[in-house]
Each structure stands twice: as structure tokens, then as C-alpha cells.
Amino acid sequence: MTSFKLVKYIPRIKKKKSVLRKLARKVPTDRLLKFERVFKAQKRIHMSVFKAQRVLDEIRWRYYEETVMILNLMPYRASYPILKLVYSAAANATHYRDFDKANLFITKAEVSRSTIMKKFRPRARGRSFPIKKSMCHITIVLNIVKKSK
């Protein structure tokens, strides 16, 4: 005979992302210039989405110089391609738009899934074992901040 336990229903409490964003935000949105943005995307990076997301959560809503310091000190493998992407976005901002690197601010850092590369590894007795290598697309948006008076 099986016995069933009566479990009281406990509603789940959802974490509000807006609260987390407000806590992490360093610059008020009224000081961000609306159309002064630089987009940079890197496609098909050989890395899991979850591993890249862990690093991107740390650099979102930070200044460029602070981001570079954080990424240099992070022990994760995902930090190096993201660091190259941030460097490239800042170089594009200074070269094409004449922005100052001290005023650049990361407003958007997102990662999305890409294709999965499938390979087969030979195993015992003539069998094969599938290997799935996931890839991701990373997008960084740098915004310029007005100087406070």
C-alpha cells in the first residue's frame, strides 16, 4: 500500500527583475543620451549560454573602464571572448563616433542560443556516442552618458 502526503500549496514568489535592475543601475536614465549608442554583436561563440550569462550579469549597467577591470579579474573562461567584444565595441565608438571611453556605459548585454554542433565519438564494440557542442550569440550595447554639471 502506498501512502500519500498532504502538502499545503505554497505560492511561488517571483523575483522582480526591475528591482534588480534598479539596484544595479549606476546612472539615472535621464542622463543617458537616447540615440548615442553603439551596438556590437558576436555570433557563434563556442560557449554555453548559461556560462556566458553568468559573466554578462556582472557587467550589465557598468561603465566601460570598470567592466574591463572586472573582466580581467574574472576566473571564468567566458570572460575572455566577452572582454574582446567590449574592447571592440569601445574601439568602434571612439573611431567612428568620436566618443570618449570614460563616458561609455553598458546598457544592454544579452546572450542568445545559436546552433548546436554535433559530432560523434567512437566507442567500444563499434558504437558511437554523440557529442553536442553548444554555441551562443552575444550582443553588447554601449551608451554615452552626459557629464553631470
UniProtKB/Swiss-Prot annotation:
Belongs to the universal ribosomal protein uL22 family. GO terms for biological process: translation. This is Large ribosomal subunit protein uL22c. It is found in: Plastid, Chloroplast. InterPro entries: Ribosomal_uL22, Ribosomal_uL22_bac/chlpt-type, Ribosomal_uL22_bac/org-type, Ribosomal_uL22_CS, Ribosomal_uL22_sf. Disulfide bonds: none annotated. Part of the 50S ribosomal subunit. Keywords: Chloroplast, Plastid, Ribonucleoprotein, Ribosomal protein, RNA-binding, rRNA-binding. The lineage of its organism: Eukaryota, Viridiplantae, Streptophyta, Embryophyta, Tracheophyta. GO terms for molecular function: rRNA binding; structural constituent of ribosome. Coiled coil: none annotated. SUPFAM superfamilies: Ribosomal protein L22 (SSF54843). It comes from Agrostis stolonifera (Creeping bentgrass). This protein binds specifically to 23S rRNA. Transmembrane segments: none annotated. GO terms for cellular component: chloroplast; large ribosomal subunit. Pfam families: Ribosomal_L22.
